[in-house]
């Protein structure tokens, strides 16, 4: 399944004016220098599909709710759960679910991607299993140096599509370094990870995908600087510890 085109290319010029070098949204995200995930080792991973093409990722955080990046917003969604390969028809243990209600964070700032998260309500609850399972959101904010796992189906470093879900470990970068690298775009709703000498990174096909730290959902793929996988240039993630109250209230109210 091919990734859709970059939905935020319309404001690339604005971003280039703000920061030396061009930036790219995670919404065509590739996993750089990662490897095949163990099958169904990330049972919370969701694929947001439109016209049979992956356009973003998401994370199952409740039997009827998926968390994703706000810049992935659409009027309706087909969401794949329990998937390892996007090429397999009716993969055992998988489920395709429709969704028509999504709630973007009220302070989401599209040009700058601050507060870049939204909740998508599935039309029906899913039954959790070995291949489909929700994950808890971290209540503690990330610590610099922590090793975390990011996953996705986007393009590989060689430009080819992976046949199965890809995983890569990246380290959290300090707020001081992150804010300097992405000034003036940086916002407290963001944090950085990656940018090490191993050039491991998330990048263009996977906005809204999960960053898992210590078994908890710590962040969502948001954006980064092109080309991906540069030494000293980490990717940017939505800092979910800042939004636990909003997420809980939104789920309860709907």
Swiss-Prot record:
InterPro entries: Peptidase_S1_PA, Peptidase_S1_PA_chymotrypsin, Peptidase_S1A, Trypsin_dom, TRYPSIN_HIS, TRYPSIN_SER. It is an enzyme of class 3 (hydrolase). The active site is at 71 (charge relay system), 116 (charge relay system), 207 (charge relay system). Transmembrane segments: none annotated. Zn(2+) binds at residues 40, 91. Keywords: Amelogenesis imperfecta, Biomineralization, Disulfide bond, Glycoprotein, Hydrolase, Metal-binding, Protease, Secreted, Serine protease, Signal, Zinc, Zymogen. Disulfide bonds join 37-167, 56-72, 141-241, 148-213, 178-192, 203-228. Belongs to the peptidase S1 family. Kallikrein subfamily. PANTHER family: KALLIKREIN-4 (PTHR24271:SF65), KALLIKREIN-RELATED (PTHR24271). This is Kallikrein-4. The lineage of its organism: Eukaryota, Metazoa, Chordata, Craniata, Vertebrata.
């Amino acid at each position: 399944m091919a990734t859709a085109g970059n939905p935020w290319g319309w404001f690339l010029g604005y971003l280039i004016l703000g920061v030396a070098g061009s930036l790219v949204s995670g919404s065509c995200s590739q996993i750089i220098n990662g490897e095949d995930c163990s099958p169904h080792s990330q049972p919370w991973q969701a694929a947001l599909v439109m016209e049979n093409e992956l356009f973003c990722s998401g994370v199952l955080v409740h039997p009827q709710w998926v968390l994703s990046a706000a810049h992935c917003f659409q009027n309706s969604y087909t969401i794949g759960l329990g998937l390892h390969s996007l090429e397999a028809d009716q993969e055992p243990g998988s489920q395709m679910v429709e969704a028509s209600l999504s709630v973007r964070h009220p302070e989401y700032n599209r040009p700058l991607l601050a507060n870049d998260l939204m909740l998508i309500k599935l039309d029906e609850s899913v039954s959790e299993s070995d291949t489909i399972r929700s994950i808890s959101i971290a209540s503690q904010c990330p610590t610099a140096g922590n090793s975390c796992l990011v996953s996705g189906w986007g393009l590989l470093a060689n430009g080819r599509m992976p046949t199965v879900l890809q995983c890569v470990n990246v380290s959290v970068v300090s707020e001081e370094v992150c804010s300097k690298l992405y000034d003036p775009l940086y916002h407290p709703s963001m944090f950085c990870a990656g940018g090490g000498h191993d050039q491991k990174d998330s990048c263009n096909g996977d906005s809204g995908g999960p960053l898992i730290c210590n078994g908890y959902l710590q962040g969502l793929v948001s954006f980064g600087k092109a080309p991906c996988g540069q030494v000293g240039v980490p990717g940017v993630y939505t800092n979910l510890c800042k939004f636990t109250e909003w997420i809980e209230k939104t789920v309860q109210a709907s």
